[in-house]
A protein has these predicted regions:
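Active-site helix of classical SDR
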Residues: 119, 155, 163
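Conserved glycine-rich Rossmann-like NAD(P)H-binding loop of the short-chain dehydrogenase/reductase
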Residues: 29-46
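Substrate-binding pocket helix/loop in short-chain dehydrogenase/reductase
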Residues: 95-96, 100-108, 190, 201
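Residue(s) in the substrate-gating loop at a strand-loop-helix junction
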Residues: 139
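Alpha-helical segment proximal to the catalytic Tyr-Lys
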Residues: 124, 168-172, 229
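Conserved glycine-rich cofactor-binding loop
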Residues: 15-16
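Short, small/polar-rich loop/turn modules that mediate ligand/substrate recognition or access, typified
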Residues: 171, 176, 231-233, 239
């Protein structure tokens, strides 16, 4: 178990399956967790189950114009943030020939633009303390591409490139910035797939199984730890061998 005692973590997308798993694991390691998402009831339920102190921030990342205020509020409320995990994201899937420009823009705004603003504003605060860990949640499709997800793939590919750039800017200040690129992970989204769809996906995964949210949480807690202090600008692929790079 990694020791994150009294480290302060701000986690977006905290109400989903992966977010919940990350929050629980970080709390078990002693971290104080700030939970951010749109669904306040889910956040309250999650907060009540954690072993350490937590904070709830009801916020919609599509509200780009108020993101800077959100960062200030979270940092002030938690009295400084050591670890930022940008886990929130949306999809608006359809073939590119049918995709509305607004649907492309909406996904880019939530998945990429908001992540940039959070990285930029939080890194500036971390720089003053000469310590910080930032983890951005990318995706295997940001590298492979995926039909019907031009907007989502663009947002995740952009996130990977952005992370490399920002990581170079802050590496000398004690701040590491990395991506995690999950493959197919068991979530409510995979639960609704037909058996035929699941079989088609599993045939592409050498391990022959979907990942669990805890697989992503375990990767995140390593990147947030002191043991990962010499790792920055990287994309850690967690996909059962579906993509080997």
């Amino acid at each position: 178990m990694f020791n994150l005692k009294d480290k302060k973590v701000l986690l977006t997308g905290a109400s989903g399956g992966i977010g919940q798993s990350i929050a629980e694991l970080f709390s078990e390691a002693g971290a104080i967790v700030g939970l951010a998402a749109r669904n306040e009831e889910k956040l309250k339920s999650l907060a009540s189950s954690l072993k350490t102190k937590s904070y709830i921030f009801k916020f919609d990342l599509s509200n780009i114009e108020n993101l800077e205020t959100f960062v200030e509020e979270a940092d002030k409320t938690m009295e400084g943030i050591d670890i930022l995990i940008c886990n929130a994201g949306i999809t608006k899937d359809t073939l590119s020939m049918k995709m509305k420009t607004q649907d492309f823009k909406d996904v880019i705004d939530v998945n990429l633009t908001s992540t940039f603003i959070l990285n930029r504003d939080m890194a500036k605060k971390m720089m003053r303390r000469r310590y910080g860990r930032i983890i951005n949640m990318a995706s295997i499709v940001g590298v492979l591409g995926n039909p019907g997800q031009a907007n989502y793939c663009a947002s995740k590919a952009g996130m990977i490139g952005m992370t490399k750039s920002i990581a170079q800017e802050y590496a000398s200040r004690g701040i590491t910035i990395n991506c995690i690129a999950p493959g197919f992970i068991k979530t409510p989204m995979t639960d609704v797939l037909t058996d035929e769809q699941k079989s088609a996906m599993l045939s592409k995964i050498p391990e022959g199984k979907f990942g669990e949210p805890k697989d992503i949480a375990n990767t995140a807690i390593f990147l947030a730890s002191d043991e990962a202090s010499y790792i920055t600008g990287q994309t850690i692929h967690v996909n059962g061998g579906m993509l080997m790079v």
